[in-house]
Amino acid sequence: MAIRPVKFSRLAQPTMEGAGVNLHRVFGFGDTKPFDPFLMMDDFRNDDPNKYMKGFPWHPHRGIETITYVLSGTVEHADSLGNNGSLSDGDIQWMTAGSGIIHQEMPKGNKNGAMHGFQLWANLPSNQKMTAPRYQDIKSKEIKSLVDDDGTIIKVIAGDYRGYKGPVDGIAAEPEYLDIYIPPLKFKRFPFDTSRQGFAYIFEGDGDFHNASNPVGIKVEKEFNGQEFELRDLSGNRTLVVFDNGDEVAVQAGEKGIRFLLISGTPIKEPVAWHGPIVMLSVSYTHLTLPTIYSV
């Protein structure tokens, strides 16, 4: 087995979207090649309702699919197909914009005013960009959780992991999307298909992906349960870690444990032309999109 080395890592960047929602952009609107088939990912997390309550009013999408994963709080949504509903703690929404859809997403937070979730954009291949739009809300009870003997918890949101199939299905990118918690100072390996590109995004605790390929030989600065460990190059909260080639990912959890998303997909390898929420093959197609969506 070949452990995937870290190609690069960086912190998510603060930005503002929608009608004034403060969030952190994990990646997006730049070079998409390291993330293909994924286009963008946002971490929307805030304890102050004034920084998210205005939400994301009516806006269009075309040529993409989105996966929204709510950790805490509530997001109310509606679209031009007549669908409406809400997402709460642990719920997911998968939306295929396809040929075009107009929708809104309005975060409401929880009883303490806290809101936390993620939205991931996946590209649609050229032969599916004009497919009929559709969406599905998935409740938290539908998500399988695996608990290892060492206390590691793996939630399978999409893909097939150790025989457990995630409820998010039918996405062109065929993503594997895992929410993983590893207890303090535990070392874990996770299989990773060699044909896929992928990344980890840390949102709680910290850990080491850089030196995890040699966990035993790392000298120890601190004693824990009779053993010594040195945790170098720790990556912490809001850190994106992008992997190079290999067939597994290894991580050494830090002293507080680590929780992260591990996401991969099969590259589409097609041109990407952005016009805000519209993603097509060329700029000429994006300019033709808005009039046709709003005329529906």
Placement of each model-derived feature along the sequence:
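A short glycine-rich, His/Asp/Glu-containing loop-to-beta-strand
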Residues: 16-71, 143-189
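Extended, compositionally biased flexible segments
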Residues: 46-112
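Glycine- and acidic-residue-biased ligand/ion/polar-headgroup-sensing regions
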Residues: 62-76, 193-229
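Short acidic-glycine-tyrosine-enriched beta hairpin
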Residues: 81-94, 207-250
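Tight coil/turn sites that cap or link beta-strands
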Residues: 90, 98, 183-187, 195
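Ligand-binding loop in jelly-roll beta-barrel domains
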Residues: 98-128, 234-271
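Non-heme Fe(II) oxygenase catalytic core, chiefly the N-lobe of the double-stranded beta-helix
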Residues: 99-100, 104-165, 169-175, 182
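Conserved small/polar residues in nucleotide/adenosyl-binding loops
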Residues: 286-292
